[in-house]
Amino acid sequence: MPKQNKYKGVSVDYRYGDESVARFINAVMLDGKKDVATRIVYDAFTIIAEKMNGESPLEVYRKAMSNIAPVVEVRSKRVGGATYQIPMEVKPSRRGALAFRWLKLYAKRRGGRSMAEKLAAELMDAANEQGASVKKRDEVHRMADANKAFAHFRF
């Protein structure tokens, strides 16, 4: 018998039938309130559909996720009393998780309006390669590029 059960995955969301959207809803969820998170995400998609004439909100979401997701990041490793920031490639599952986390964080930090409006604005900005979450991805990439000299210390 295995020590840990196999990962079962996430069921698809009921409106778009997309596993990535279901994962994003789970990332937006606070205190187990999935209905609230679902309403926020679907309202944001409705706002995107209204503002981006003719473009599918799912396509905007996918484009935003690909623009936010980091390819490399730095990880700390202690070697001989010194700690080095070592650039490492990001696994696909972590790539998505970081994109969700940054999108939620920077949408929440936007001023005023409802969370759905802030999330829609951040998604549209990210799809156009703007916004705070894209800047965060660029910052992470710059850190990895600056520490390229320590790449030979890989784990």
UniProtKB/Swiss-Prot annotation:
Any one of the GO CC terms: small ribosomal subunit
Q: Which UniProt keywords apply?
A: Ribonucleoprotein, Ribosomal protein, RNA-binding, rRNA-binding, tRNA-binding
Q: Could you tell me the Gene Ontology terms of the biological process aspect for this record? A: translation
Q: What Gene Ontology molecular-function terms does this entry list? A: rRNA binding; structural constituent of ribosome; tRNA binding
The protein's matches in SUPFAM superfamilies, at most eight in alphabetical order, are given as: Ribosomal protein S7
- Per the UniProt record, one Pfam family is Ribosomal_S7
**InterPro entries cross-referenced by the UniProt entry:** Ribosomal_uS7, Ribosomal_uS7_bac/org-type, Ribosomal_uS7_dom, Ribosomal_uS7_dom_sf
Keyword match Ribosomal protein: yes
Q: What does this protein do?
A: One of the primary rRNA binding proteins, it binds directly to 16S rRNA where it nucleates assembly of the head domain of the 30S subunit. Is located at the subunit interface close to the decoding center, probably blocks exit of the E-site tRNA.
Q: What quaternary structure, including any partners, is listed in this protein's UniProt entry?
A: Part of the 30S ribosomal subunit. Contacts proteins S9 and S11.
The record's listing under HAMAP family reads: Ribosomal_uS7_B (MF_00480_B)
Q: Tell me its family.
A: Belongs to the universal ribosomal protein uS7 family.
> NCBIfam families annotated for this entry?
rpsG_bact (TIGR01029)
The identity of this protein, by name, is: Small ribosomal subunit protein uS7
Q: What is the originating organism of this protein?
A: Chlorobium phaeobacteroides (strain DSM 266 / SMG 266 / 2430)
